Amino acid sequence: MNITWIIAILILMLFAHIVDDYYLQGWLASAKQKKWWEKNAPDKLYKFDYIMALFCHALSWSTMIFLPILVYSLINNVSLNLFYLAIPINLIIHAIVDDLKANKFKINLIVDQSIHFIQIIITWVIFLFIYCN
């Protein structure tokens, strides 16, 4: 794999992060907050619905950041084993981090985004290690 592909994949992963975390979240940005449910649907039936919103956003984000690697893998007919691990691991981390920011108020936006960037870099480095050896 040449350096152009390597850098392009990282840039596309970062771009996918920006698109998904800022432009595609829409209603989920509100729905992943407990306080939104308490205000708009105070019935006990909806008490934990914010968890599903966190899950949906984290799944979308995890899939989006992996799309450049997925496309590369399909074009070059290489194993998708990383896909089966990266999506659930990134999903869990992303959901926990967003919950810490949106509901627990333990971290701010800078820490939230820094952790997401680290997730992307680690996923990219693992991709390089697997596919460039």
Model-derived segments and spans:
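Core segments of transmembrane alpha-helices
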Residues: 52-71, 115-123
